[in-house]
Design a protein with these regions (language model features):
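Conserved GHKL (Bergerat-fold) ATPase module
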Residues: 6-517
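Conserved ATP-binding N-box helix of the HATPase_c
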Residues: 1-2
Length: 517
């Protein structure tokens, strides 16, 4: 306790004599008659010597504002030292020449006895919600949207949850959900009351059914708490679905800001996913948004779905990019065929798509550089050429390079470097694990599996085939090697960034070609 002694002087309305109750630190107490002119109660704390910090006016005000900002009874705070200084300055002020007393400014309570969450949603305007948000959380930015909860019996709790605005992906997404008991602050971010994955939100919850002094063990084993938590999840999902269905334009405008939150929540709680799955959007390269179902319907309508196996539903491939600039060539090829490309450029996206695939067997995700031939190949026979295989293995410096031959619909592209979807996901997972554990990134146990895809419909590949054919001119071999090296380097450049040595060799090879023109 902060006080050695506590005095309570009280007088009832009935006019009976006042009573003074004095309690000591050892638990003993005394009762005395007292003098008090009006009815009411005074509580006087005699602060202990080692707790004198609680005599500081600013500390007391901070404590009152933290715990009692919304108490239903008005609280007035007076700093007697500050008031005395103010009166002394006022008496000496030159402005009081006639000696008359100025009207004393009416005192204002430090608390709001009618907080916004106690009102009906129909009584609150958007400006009310925004003002309350700025007041409580000291954020100068307006929230994206909010959820006003007014649960009746048997849950009997109220609150407002806000989706905060984030300016960039590196900004902290840790939220703040304040728990109140009959408008008295209890604690922040109690994960037993609100699921951990919802703690990225900001808001207030007033649960009068909870005891003021809550303990973790009590909350973990309390049926009421689990029902409150489930109801909050339901209200959040209902809000997402409502915005997606009835206010789609606004929902799409805020999707990029809430995308990480929704994906993380879906991964943490299958029930959340089941309720909110229809509100999950895919951002496309043209800036538009579609649901997974809408993407699937268009792919089926356009004939971009492989025939289904007997007795099974067709599997729709959702093609995506992780870097619109680096993978621009692949994007152009797909868009030329009318295939939509989703943008999944966040760290959490890799884990999220794996979760979606595990929940829905009719959908799979594939980056556009994994196996583009499946979507871009043309009809017709393809003839493999082992001489070209050896030529490109030599050009790449990798005698185990896998080389495939396909006839693509776009004849202008001679070759593409593809990377296995599974090996790339494994590498990304290892990088993410190293970031989470704070450890040093290790060399991958399974290196990325690259495949060079040669487009047999390309005139350049046809020319290269002729240069390595039997009966070609004597200088054809040197030209073939020069062309193969340049095709390989351009394929690498379209797939990833060059290393320092690769860049040096690319520049040297390009200059060599120019000198021979």
């Amino acid at each position: 306790m902060v006080a050695d002694d506590i005095e309570v002087v009280t007088k009832s309305w009935s006019g009976t004599p006042a009573v003074r109750w004095l309690c000591h630190a050892d638990g003993s107490y005394e009762l005395f008659p007292a003098e008090r002119e009006t009815h009411g109660t005074d509580v006087i704390l005699h602060i202990a010597a080692d707790e004198e910090e609680f005599l500081n006016a600013q500390k007391l005000r901070d404590m009152l504002e933290k715990y009692c900002s919304f108490m239903p009874t008005e609280i007035y705070f007076t700093d007697e030292d500050a008031e005395a200084d103010k009166e002394e300055k006022s008496e000496n002020s030159e402005s009081r020449e006639d000696g008359s007393a100025d009207a004393k400014t009416a005192e204002k309570p430090i608390n709001d006895t009618h907080p916004l969450w106690q009102k009906s949603p129909s009584e609150c305007t958007p400006d009310d919600y925004k003002a309350f948000y700025r007041k409580v959380f000291h954020d100068y930015r307006d929230p994206l949207f909010w959820i006003h909860i007014n649960a009746d019996y048997p849950l009997n709790f109220k609150g407002i949850l806000y989706f905060p605005r984030l300016d960039n992906e590196y900004e902290s997404i840790e939220g703040q959900v304040k728990l109140y008991y009959n408008q008295v602050f209890v604690a922040d971010n109690i994960k037993e009351v609100i699921p951990e994955y919802l703690l990225m939100l900001k808001g207030v919850l007033d649960c009068p059914e909870l005891p003021l002094n809550v303990s973790r063990s009590y909350l973990q084993n309390n049926t009421y708490v689990s029902k409150v938590s489930a109801h909050i999840v339901k209200k959040v999902c209902d809000k997402l679905n409502s915005l997606c269905n009835t206010d789609r334009e606004n929902y799409e405008s805020v999707w990029d800001s809430i995308k990480t939150f929704v994906e993380y929540a879906c991964m943490r709680d299958r029930k959340f996913y089941d309720r909110a799955k229809d509100a999950i959007l895919l951002t496309l390269t043209d800036g538009s948004h579609v649901t997974v179902e809408q993407y699937s319907e268009k792919a089926k309508a356009d004939g971009h779905v492989a025939p289904a196996e007997e007795g099974k539903d067709p599997v729709v491939t959702v093609y995506y990019t992780t870097d619109r600039e680096l993978q621009a060539q692949y994007i152009a090829l797909f868009e030329a065929q009318g295939i939509q490309i989703a943008v999944l450029d966040k760290l959490v996206d890799t884990q999220f798509v794996q979760m979606l695939e595990s929940y829905d067997a009719t959908v799979k995700f594939q980056r556009i550089d994994a196996d583009p031939a499946a979507a871009l190949k043309a009809d017709g026979d393809v003839t493999e050429n082992q001489t070209l295989v050896e030529l490109f293995r030599k050009a790449s410096g990798n005698d185990k390079l896998e080389v495939r031959f396909e006839a693509l619909k776009d004849a202008s592209l001679p070759a593409m470097l593809t990377v296995s979807e599974q090996s790339r996901r494994m590498e990304e997972m290892m990088k993410l694990y190293a970031m989470q554990t704070g450890g040093k990134e290790q060399a991958p146990l399974f290196p990325l599996e690259y495949t060079l895809l040669l487009n047999t419909a390309s005139p350049l590949i046809s020319k290269l085939t002729a240069l390595v054919a039997e009966g070609a001119p004597e200088d054809a071999s040197g030209k073939a090697e020069l062309i193969a090296e340049q095709i390989w380097r351009l394929s690498v450049l379209a797939q990833r960034k060059f290393t320092a040595d690769e860049l040096k060799n690319f520049l040297a090879g390009s200059f060599d070609i120019l000198t021979k023109l």
